[in-house]
Amino acid sequence: TLRTSSAASDVYKRQGNPASPYTRKMIAYLRFKRIPHQVIWGDVSDVLKPMNIDPPKPILLPVFLLPRDGKLTAVTDSTPLIEEFENSYPDRPVYPEDQSLRFINYVLEDFGDEWCTKYMFHYRSHFAEDADNAGTLLPLGIMSNISDDELAFFKDNFAKRQIDRLWVVGSNDETAPFIDQSYKSFLEILENHLKIQPYLLGSSPSSCDFAVYGQLTQLIGFDPTPRKIAHEIAPRVIGWVRSLEDRSGLEVKENNLTLSDLPQTIHDLFKEMSISYVPTMIANKKAIDEGSDEWDIELDKGKWKQKSFPYQAKCLAWIKEEYEKLDTDKKDEVFSFLQLNHCESLVTSNE
């Protein structure tokens, strides 16, 4: 357990950057849970060095300092971190009570973390205006009191770092139209969903809400091009993101929803995932299994090509592990839902 007998020692330190979607995901989660925490803005290595704490490998934001074997250790990766916090802080749960719905939440959280991030990285560096904006603001998110010459130096470094990462998310001239259309479709579905329900899976946020929220903080609050798109077609989404930043005051009611209670908009979202997130996750896993450095696939609306990404292959394996944990009747219920929305290959591929 993360909790100790001393309240003071249960104030968790975490490092990140305001322009990091996963940092924003975890801050909003901790606020909703009312878990005491301190946010440290700054370069991870610079912050950890005086503490004699080794940085995680690789360094992914945010970085939490958590007790491991009697000493503080730098820990990263938001999804298992949320699970660890949920086990220690069961009040105000972000996992649905219903087992089938909890699995759907797990898939949607991964969709937010692994597909919606493609929107974010694509828009941040694909267009000149967005790349210039990111190059200027990313270093200022770490330290604002720097000279113009220092800013120019850091701007070049940050811009290069962002562009070098595009291969991971598959952003290129060939895939750009598909990413743009997928982002707009996602916004339209979420906009329609928010007309009838305040959160993705009920009356209070689940972990999948925070995953989607994290990416959207950047898409509508940092990068010019996707922000303009969102303001044109999804005003409810904009309001939703702004309010989810701090839901510590939301009084949580018992959530007794089941899979059959999900509105049509969630089915629509999974159908959208079936032509984007699902086939690319499976193609990437196949490439990793075959030892291929890159892969391509024909999607309904165009060709997708990118370098193989080992971490996302692990994500698909974890989804299957979660599915195998389900009771037989719940497994059948989930499979029917996935099959209805053309996503069953998430749990059947490579069987």
Set out the residue ranges of the language-model regions.
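N-terminal G-site helix/loop of the GST-like fold
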Residues: 13-43, 54, 80, 89-91
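GST superfamily/GST-like fold recognition
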Residues: 200-220
